[in-house]
Amino acid sequence: MKKLFAVLLAVLMVAVMATAMAETTLKVAGWDITTTPYYTAIKEGFEAANPDIKIEWVDLASQDYNIKASTMLSGGDTTDLYCVKELSDLQNWSKEGLVVPMNDMIAADGYDMSKYAGMDACYVSMADGQQYALPFRADFWVMFYNKDLFDKAGVAYPTNDWTWDEYAAIAREVAEKTGAYGTHYHTWLSCVANWAVCDGVNTLADGKYDDLVYFYELYQGFEDDGICMSYDELKASGMHYSGAFAQGNIAMMPMGYWYASTLIGYIKDGTASMNWGIAAVPHLEGVAAGSSFGSPTGIAISAASANKDAAWKFASWMCSEDGAKAIATTGTRPAYVSEGVAEVMASAEGFPTDETSKGALLPAAIALEWPIGEGVNEIKTIVNEEHTLIMTREVEINEGIAAMEERAAEYIK
């Protein structure tokens, strides 16, 4: 009898252990997974806190992410969660029932939504008022610069209060004195045109684009004089901005703050070796110093997920203070705002220690890159198309601007 009891007890223990060891694997779609360190920090932090759930990242190409993610969602792909790159995409996904509303989950957990500085509102559907994603990153644009090239040129580092005209003069001076590129513009529309929205008044969807002329002229002047790489060269080579700056022959590069984590990683693994810093992006006269543009990056749960409870557990952790601290260790700015998170950001290994770089973490204002509204997707397509024609010199700047306004007028309500 004792032997039988021992056998039954052993079987029971095995069954209990097997149940305890049962794991749920969540597939989470994002972009630039292998070059963005915070994905690893999120995975490791969450799995340590939740050993019964494993995270498997699904890496989609950055330039194709919106199209690929939308195709996967509409096709019923079993990927559980999707990072949200564009606010307009989430609006479409929610209208089509492709992602799960989170309001009931938020209420059931008593989840604190007060720590996002209002950025969570970007993920509320205009159609039904439901919350369809939570923000985990709060990206805004800064100026990255190579201190070594500035030192070589004998030029003072950028400050957090400088104008676009001052930036232009500095780019030319450093290029002239070092033979390096004074600045670098990636091929995105935002790298050239979005500075016009930093005043918080203009938008790229308002149908008025005269304010873009200054920035196109600025860029083309740089390109003509070899101060930056040409648009055609970059498009033909497919060079990624992260690798371009890491080569060490570019003095400045306006880019989203997310690049800080990549650059810190490059310094650690030897891909890059320069001393670097960040400053606030330049401003136009009459616009507050430290003004920038940006948008949150969020996480949404697929309606096709078979693991919605586990998916919510991951999303809510990723966007919480614990998740924010994990993200901040890589030099990335989380969406969750607290003193604890700020302390982690400032102490991230590899982050510049100078006061200008620290000050650049606190922008005066962040304008939304694209507003949310009817017709915005169509206008975005138009602006990008005409932007490409201007950048490739197929049309004159004023001709392209006029075409933007004429074509966008059809969608202005």
PLM regions and their residue ranges:
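Short, well-ordered beta-strand elements
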Residues: 23-33, 53-58, 80-81, 132, ...
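Hinge/lid segment of periplasmic solute-binding proteins
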Residues: 86-140, 273-280, 347-351, 359
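Extracytoplasmic "Venus flytrap"/periplasmic binding protein-like
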Residues: 45-115, 152-154, 244, 249-252, ...
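Long, aromatic- and glycine/proline-rich binding clefts that accommodate carbohydrate-like moieties
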Residues: 279, 329-382, 389
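Short, polar/charged alpha-helical segment
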Residues: 33-54, 382-383, 401
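Extracytoplasmic/periplasmic substrate-recognition and gating elements
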Residues: 48, 54, 129, 153, ...
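Glycine-centered hinge/linker elements that transmit conformational signals in sensory
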Residues: 171, 204-235, 281
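A structural signal for short loop-to-beta-strand junctions that line the ligand-binding cleft
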Residues: 72, 79-80, 109-149, 181-182, ...
